[in-house]
Amino acid sequence: MKPIFREVNLAHHIGRAIHLIDAHCQEVVGQGKKYNPDIDYLCMGSNTGLLHTFDIEDNDKVVGYAVFMIAKDFITSERSASNVAMYVSPEYRGRTAVRFMQYTEMMLLSKGIKQINFHVPPSSMAEKCLAHLGYNLREKVYYKEF
């Protein structure tokens, strides 16, 4: 069966994707480190329209997701979407992941979004994919852990 893409309400859908959230956290944070996604906060954002969530399903199983936070630009007041999480099971990375990114972009544009931002690790496959889809490097993000 061909994977399908959908927009979903994270608050109603979180249970079906928890296995992917675990895999995503292990990939990002690493084995043995503590991770603690704030599920209540994510569900509240989804219920208020501040978060838009999309998924990939194959044979009734969630195999990928993307979560975007919606905000108004400080300077222009145009609506923008910042990707706060995206994970695709390794066996679906490649064409399916690219089509999924195109789908999320199309859906966000249809909601009046004027700008989409992604934060990705340097030299990741996602960075190459975003460049292929026409995204440009605009800023660098610096952070400090305490």
Regions found by a protein language model. Give the residues of each.
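A short helix-loop-beta-strand connector motif used in the catalytic cores of GNAT acetyltransferases and
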Residues: 43-55
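A conserved beta-turn-beta hairpin within the catalytic core of GNAT-like acetyltransferases
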Residues: 72-83
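Conserved catalytic-core motifs of GNAT/GCN5-like acyltransferases
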Residues: 119-120, 136-146
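Short amphipathic alpha-helix that is part of the acyltransferase structural core
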Residues: 1-36
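Conserved beta-strand-loop-alpha-helix junction that forms the acyl-donor binding cleft
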Residues: 116-127
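A short, internal acetyl-CoA/4′-phosphopantetheine-binding micro-motif in the GNAT/acyltransferase core
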Residues: 84-94
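Conserved acetyl-CoA-binding loop-helix of GNAT-fold acetyltransferases
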Residues: 93-106
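Conserved beta-strand in the GNAT
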Residues: 55, 61-70
